Amino acid sequence: MATTVLVGPNGSGKSTLLGVLAGVIKPTSGVLVRTGDRPPAFVPQRGAVGDTLPLTVRQAVEMGRWGERGPWRRLTRRDHTTVDAALDRLGIGALASRQLGELSGGQRQRALIAQGLAQESDLLLLDEPTTGLDIEARERIGELLTALVADGVTVVQATHDLEAARAADACLLLQNGRLTGQGRPEQVLTTSALTQVWQTL
């Protein structure tokens, strides 16, 4: 299992590619082939989830079980165990009864990632998971993602964080909806390649 990062300026197609991989955006051409029994878990940008949603942290994480149960069926004991495990894994069990809108940026991002974990997929898609977070929150999420990969989860994340990108196993460099580079981060994220992508904005 591995971590793949999608790197590129705003508007380069990172979020669109994640949406296609998640199955929420239909590709305009080509065919997407996936293996595995479960659909990927998709964690959107924090800004895509409204601050005013009247949800507790636990309720938000429980939404990760909807793919298994549907939004109207009662959660089973196993569902509750899965949700508890996701809350504990992200270190937010003590925040379970808090409203999402009351959380700090880092806490809220961990709640969204916990929702992704509750889906029990072997593919986790993350859109800018550390954008706008302080160093401590970024490091905590980075450590968590490393641990998930060690446990057999494949992680694909869009990021502007070049330090995090250089620590990944593979990198896709995007520009204007096109792939301009792929491979190991040290091969793709060269000074000349980054300069070319960002100077042509």
Regions found by a protein language model. Give the residues of each.
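Conserved ABC ATPase signature
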Residues: 99-103, 107
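Helix-to-loop junction immediately C-terminal to a conserved catalytic motif
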Residues: 22
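H-loop (His-switch) and adjacent beta-strand-loop-beta switch element
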Residues: 168-184
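Conserved catalytic motifs of ABC-family nucleotide-binding domains
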Residues: 120
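Conserved ABC ATPase "signature" region
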Residues: 77-95
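Catalytic Walker B motif of ABC-type/P-loop ATPase nucleotide-binding domains
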Residues: 124-128
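ABC ATPase C-loop
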Residues: 116-117
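Helix N-cap at the start of a conserved alpha-helix in ABC-type nucleotide-binding domains
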Residues: 135-137
